[in-house]
Structures are given as C-alpha cells and as structure tokens.
Amino acid sequence: MDADFWLDRWREGRTHFHQTRVTPLLQKYWPALDVPAGGQVLVPLAGKSLDMVWLAGQGLRVLGVELSQLAVEQFFDENGLRPEIHQSAQGRHYVAGNLELICGDVFALEDATLAACAGVYDRAALVALPEPMRKRYAREVYGRLGRGCRGILITLDYPQDQMEGPPFSVDDAEVQALYAGHTEARLIDRRDILDKEPKFNQRGVARLDTLVYRLERLG
C-alpha cells in the first residue's frame, strides 16, 4: 500500500473498513492490560475510528497517526471537537483534550514519541500493509516502543490466494515472526467471522477468522 492508494480511498469514499461503532473486541480485552491512567496510547493508521474516542474515555491520552487529512478533519468534525493545530517534523498535529491525531507518516514518528507510549492499539494498520511493509512496520514502529508497552493487535486470517488485499491476511505464524525478538504477541482469541463479512464471501473467500493478540514490548 502506497500513500496515494490510501489517500485516494478516503477522497473517493471507499472506506468500508471504517466502523460506525466501537470495536467489541477492544472493549472486551483492553481493560485487562492495565495501562495506567493518563498513559499515552498509539493508534497507527487511525482513520477516524471511534475506538479512539472510547480509549480517551478510559482516561488515556490517545495518539493517532493518519496519512489522510480528510480522515483527521472528519474525525474531529463528526465528534464535535475543535482541535488546536500545530506543525512538527512528525506531521500536522490536531489536539483536543486527551485526543491527538498526527496527520503524517507513522514511520516519521520520533524515537521519543514511540518510547513514551504506554499502550498501542492496532485494528486496521498491520492488515492494511503488504508483506514487505509489514516487516518494516513491525521493526521500525513496534521495535521502538518503550519497554513494557502493552496493547491489542487484531488481524485477519484467510486464504490470501482467494482475494487480493487490503485488508491482507496475517496469520499467527507471520505475527510471531514479525514480533519475535522485541514484542511478545500472545493469541488470546480467534473466531470465525465469515458470516459477518459478506464482501469476503462475495469475493470467493471460503474461510475468514479474526485473531486477537495481547502485545507486550520486551526489555
């Protein structure tokens, strides 16, 4: 996935990946992480996800990163927020209370920014990236998070030869290989969701599972 592909999808309204509700799996599994109140939570490729509003409501400082300025502006407009805006080397920052979105490239985040994150939530980032970029993403983003940073990762597992991504299939073997050496990725839930995703069925996908991981950055 290149930047233009992602930006075009937002401009053209091809954003079926956007959910109009908070992700139930986030609500179910996040509390057990015990991320401290006031801790900063990274949400990469954030779009305009309502999950960020929910995380902020848990007393956390949310740091979303999103390439599309349109998505960032829609997030604040649709949630009735008027952000303060400033620029840095990392991108254009939109800040309202404990919600901050950086309109920019997640790979441009500085070491200090990532090291300061106490939590991370990834529902739509890893699965949006093609294989070579997934390796870079895991290494350069997760590999720079601070020791003890905890989070939730949600992926999809389906026969990749039956459908072109994104979203891409990222099975357990790949997750373990991507995070080996710097992050513990423990599979805590797996469920068949094919009957809830008709677009996959229509494209000939015979099996579709969602996988949920508890992440913890190793020292």
UniProtKB/Swiss-Prot annotation:
A single Gene Ontology CC term: cytoplasm
Domain of life: Bacteria
Listed EC numbers: 2.1.1.67
Keyword Phosphoprotein in record: no
Keywords, comma-separated and alphabetical: Cytoplasm, Methyltransferase, S-adenosyl-L-methionine, Transferase
Record-annotated membrane-spanning stretches: none
Subcellular location: Cytoplasm
The keyword Transferase belongs to this UniProt entry's keyword annotation: yes
Binding sites annotated in the UniProt record for S-adenosyl-L-methionine: 10, 45, 66, 123
Pfam family, one: TPMT
Record's catalysed reaction(s): S-adenosyl-L-methionine + a thiopurine = S-adenosyl-L-homocysteine + a thiopurine S-methylether
GO molecular function terms listed in the Swiss-Prot or TrEMBL record: thiopurine S-methyltransferase activity
InterPro entries reported in the protein's UniProt record: SAM-dependent_MTases_sf, Thiopur_S-MeTfrase_Se/Te_detox, Thiopurine_S-MeTrfase, TPMT
Family to which the UniProt record says this protein belongs: Belongs to the class I-like SAM-binding methyltransferase superfamily. TPMT family.
Protein known as: Thiopurine S-methyltransferase
Organism in which the protein naturally occurs: Bordetella parapertussis (strain 12822 / ATCC BAA-587 / NCTC 13253)
Gene transcribed to yield this protein: tpm
